[in-house]
Amino acid sequence: MKIAVAMSGGVDSSVAAALLKEQGHEIIGITMQFFAPSCQGAGTPAHDAAVVAAHLGITHHLLDLEHDFRQLIINDFISQYRSGQTPNPCVRCNRFVKFGLLLDAARERGADLLATGHYARTSIDPDGTRHLRVAANLRKDQTYFLHTLSQERLARVVFPLGDIGSKDEVRDLAHRFGLPVAEKGDSQEVCFIPNDDYVSYLEENCALGGETGDIVHVNGRLLGRHRGTHRYTIGQRKGLGIAWSEPLYVVEIDAARKLVVVGEEPHVYAQGLKAEEVGWIIAPGKEEFEASCKIRYRHQPVACRVTLLQGGACRVLFHEPLKAVTPGQSVVFYQDDEVLGGGRITAAIKRDGEA
């Protein structure tokens, strides 16, 4: 079978390529180029992926997606911050770029499947229904970022690392294969944000500085001024610059009115949330059902009740109040170890009975 591997130059995708080659598949490597061709020196994804491909004796391609990445990912990222939301660009990138444009490019190059270094597992029923399941390595599980995959796309992807129990095992494999990136560190940052400094990136590249406004308490009292709503996210405690008898947290961001609303810790908790752009890998059998959900990547799933609404929306009520429900982030639904689907959080539900 001919399999294209999305090669980032890191350990995970390199081991994925090596494992598939060892299994006897015909492998081609594809590296997505999101930035200028000048960004291809030693240590860059393009360079390191090419070195690994040469080591494995496989063909390596560069896929120029600089324009598409800016239009689909960076511009949306900026727009979401302008509107007072906190986006998750990695979820959107997986949907439109990795398992959209890259998947199509792999097929154009004659590949039967696309493999990535994601930590996730898939399974298939006798009737052909595909399932996305959490990885054996729960600490590295990345299914949160993959909830937008459809049945059609799941049929065309493979995750070779899904059954590997630890990152140490992956590095051991990298050494066994003699990969030149075996000791390369993991990337923890959004790829287009230098040093993970969102504020500097937005102000230096996106003209989001200088839009000052008020910081107000939930009781309406004016507490101070801020230098732009893009500097804040729901649940934030540090960096508010406000003296108060108790710790204060960001409770609401109203970008249109240039308001940052803060309150004591109880005000950060929500009874539920509303979400839009909801999609399902496995369609729910009824309009209301019990599930578990995650509202951020590193959060543990919590029990909830989901109610489907018109227009691809849903309402979610938690069994126990949850802290820092953040518009712009994704809510992802699980049944045991299976991903059902997910959507984009648009609002927190703070009180019982709130629509």
Swiss-Prot record:
Identify which residues the record assigns to the active site. Answer: 93, 191
User: Whose protein is this, by species?
Assistant: Pelobacter propionicus (strain DSM 2379 / NBRC 103807 / OttBd1)
Positions the record marks as coiled coil are none
Record-given protein name: tRNA-specific 2-thiouridylase MnmA
Tell me, in a sentence or two, what this protein's role is: Catalyzes the 2-thiolation of uridine at the wobble position (U34) of tRNA, leading to the formation of s(2)U34.
Kindly state which reaction or reactions the protein catalyses: S-sulfanyl-L-cysteinyl-[protein] + uridine(34) in tRNA + AH2 + ATP = 2-thiouridine(34) in tRNA + L-cysteinyl-[protein] + A + AMP + diphosphate + H(+)
Q: Does the keyword Ribonucleoprotein apply?
A: no
> What keywords tag this UniProt record?
ATP-binding, Cytoplasm, Disulfide bond, Nucleotide-binding, RNA-binding, Transferase, tRNA processing, tRNA-binding
